Amino acid sequence: MRKSAFSKIMLPLLALLLLCTPKAKAEGEYAWPANYDGVMLQGFYWDSYKDSKWTVLQANAAELSSYFNLIWVPNAGKSSANPSMGYDPVYWFSNFNSSFGNEAELRSMISTFKQFGTGIIEDVVVNHRNGATNWYDFPAETYNGKTYKLGLDAICKNDELANQTGMPQPTGAYDTGDNFDGCRDLDHTNPAVQEAVKAYL
């Protein structure tokens, strides 16, 4: 019997993922539970703005919860494009009005799934970020009493912003991750970026 291309690629990747998954150091830390046997549903697909709205998922919570333990949803923060799948994030802490619904609908969906014993996992984006009104003006956001404001030093010096005429030059370190031309690549060696990402997660 011939293996499908999917099996040839995905099975080794899944095995590698399992080998590389970190374990919790102590009880109560954020980590995948030991011996977890649940099943997760990807609650969206590309350009699924209508089918994956928070209200649509919530309306199907009872049925979905009878089959799945976790629902994976796209990034819930406001993005720079409209509509957007959430992979061009602007806000991390303060604006949860996305192409999938508003913050009240998001909270209601999470609460409903929780009543059925089903968790929600959000796809978060921390490799790159967009500004609120231009390429680099990241909004100042306050979370748990602390205000986070990233500047040009948070953007990798080899980001495409550096090649734009009339734009200020980013002053962060060279990119340590994947270059994404649609947003500003964040300098993850910068302590301010690290602190904001930890708070966001």
What name fits each language-model region?
Residues M1-M10:
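Bacterial N-terminal signal peptides that target proteins for export
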Residues M10-L19:
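Bacterial N-terminal signal peptides
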Residues K23:
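Conserved N-terminal glycine/acidic-rich loop preference
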Residues A26-A31, N35-A62, S66-L201:
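Substrate-binding/active-site clefts of carbohydrate-active enzymes
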